[in-house]
């Protein structure tokens, strides 16, 4: 058995494995994280088995062992400022091999929910993660509010063609979207600023290390490419290192692919929406006008929507049948995100079908109303649900890649 190692708390010897005097401790940290779905990791005696078996753990990322020690010691700032917290893809290998069944994988997932709530100043993320009943009420109330808000300004339902933006004015949707996106951007910026400040302080990264000259620019651009292009979008380590246990699964059911299709689909739909509005602004086509399926923006939206619905459907199915560690540990916030993503995608396809039918169905107007309300809610809740991973994980991966780049240059 390995003793409590020094690098867990950055001290010199196992006997000194306590937090430095200058570190502020939170004695309620571990019990608070349990409210976000963590198991009782007090059973963990730091044997190091989880770190040894984790395919992603390396000299600069001794997780989940280090994260668990932070929680046990009450080192909140160290925990939520750890880039390693976001490097984990929750494959469950560590929990399968834990000799005390402390469930380190479940702890890491709960710690990420806790970190999202800690970055959020509104406490909405905490409510959605820890209070299922109230969270359900909030989600339903938001959807109802946006639906009623849109319906209050609805126009005529035309029988000759499906004129969606005569039913709900396009300008109203656009202005509502701008307001919602502004609020989301503000919440995301506050959260990311808090995260970046904490990680930079822990990693000893200063402004000049990132943007202080040609050498720093080169390192930062390389780290950005590794974080966004290779890991966040390409999911290289998730696909190559974390997928070994799932090799028996056919490709279309592998977790990395399901996760990637859901992410790529969401981003593709977001891009298609922006392009559609952009083309409308420059007079190329009116928003919502039926066009051939091979029209570039329409094709992008169709392919992206199919990918998102496919990924979300399999994620829901895996959770219903508790197919893996991640599925068996789903919390309300996970279900809420999947429900919003799935409804947005399915209603979007229903609208597309209705637009191309020879005789426009009146149900298309009501599906459109639901689609708009849920889509706006999905975007509004982005910084407060598991979808916030799309914001915070790339930031953590950037610092992880930057540390690797700096280490390589120093050797």
Kindly give the residue locations of the regions a language model identified:
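Ferredoxin-type iron-sulfur electron-transfer modules and their immediate structural context
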Residues: 1-85, 394-398, 404, 409
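Alpha-helix initiation and N-capping motif
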Residues: 26, 64, 104-108, 226, ...
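Short hydrophobic/aromatic segments of transmembrane alpha-helices and their interfaces
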Residues: 34, 61, 79, 90, ...
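Iron-sulfur-cluster electron-transfer modules
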Residues: 41, 58, 68-278, 282
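Short glycine/serine/threonine-biased micro-segments
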Residues: 46, 72, 90, 309, ...
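Membrane-interface segments at loop-to-transmembrane junctions
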Residues: 123-130, 166-172, 207-218, 246-258, ...
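Hydrophobic cores of alpha-helical transmembrane segments in multi-pass integral membrane proteins
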Residues: 136-151, 178-195, 258-281, 294-321, ...
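Juxtamembrane helix-loop transition segments at the membrane interface in multi-pass membrane proteins
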Residues: 202, 318-325
């Amino acid at each position: 058995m390995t003793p409590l190692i020094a690098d867990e708390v950055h001290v010199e010897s196992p006997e000194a494995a306590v937090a430095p005097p200058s570190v502020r401790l939170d004695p309620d940290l571990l019990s608070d994280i349990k409210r976000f779905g963590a198991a009782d990791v007090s059973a963990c005696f730091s044997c190091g088995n989880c770190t040894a078996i984790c395919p992603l753990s390396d000299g600069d990322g001794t997780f989940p062992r280090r994260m668990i020690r932070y929680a046990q010691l009450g080192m909140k700032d160290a925990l939520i400022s750890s880039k390693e917290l976001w490097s984990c893809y929750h494959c469950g290998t560590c929990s399968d091999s834990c000799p005390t069944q402390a469930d380190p994988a479940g702890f890491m997932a709960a710690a990420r929910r806790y970190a999202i709530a800690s970055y959020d100043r509104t406490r909405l993320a905490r409510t959605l993660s820890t209070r299922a009943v109230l969270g359900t009420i909030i989600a339903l109330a938001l959807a109802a509010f946006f639906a009623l808000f849109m319906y209050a300004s609805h126009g005529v339902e035309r029988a000759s063609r499906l004129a969606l933006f005569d039913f709900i004015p396009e300008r109203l949707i656009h202005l509502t979207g701008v307001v919602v996106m502004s609020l989301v951007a503000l919440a995301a910026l506050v959260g990311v600023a808090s995260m970046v400040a904490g990680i930079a302080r822990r990693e000893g990264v200063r402004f000049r290390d990132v943007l202080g000259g040609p050498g720093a620019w080169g390192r930062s651009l390389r780290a950005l490419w590794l974080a966004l292009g290779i890991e966040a979008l390409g999911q290289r380590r998730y696909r190559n290192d974390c997928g070994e246990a799932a090799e028996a699964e056919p490709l279309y059911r592998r977790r990395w692919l399901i996760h990637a299709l859901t992410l790529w689909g969401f981003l593709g739909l977001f891009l298609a929406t922006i392009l559609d509005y952009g083309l409308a602004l420059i007079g190329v086509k009116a928003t919502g006008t039926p066009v051939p399926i091979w029209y570039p923006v329409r094709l992008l939206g169709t392919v992206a929507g199919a990918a998102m619905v496919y990924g979300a459907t399999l994620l829901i199915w895996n959770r219903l049948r508790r197919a893996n560690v991640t599925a068996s540990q789903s919390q309300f916030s996970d279900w809420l995100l999947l429900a919003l993503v799935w409804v947005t995608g399915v209603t979007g396809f229903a609208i597309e079908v209705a637009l191309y039918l020879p005789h426009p169905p009146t149900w298309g107007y009501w599906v459109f109303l639901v689609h708009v309300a849920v889509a706006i809610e999905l975007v509004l809740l982005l910084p407060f649900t598991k979808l916030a991973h799309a914001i915070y994980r790339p930031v953590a991966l950037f610092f992880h890649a930057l540390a690797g780049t700096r280490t390589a240059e120093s050797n």
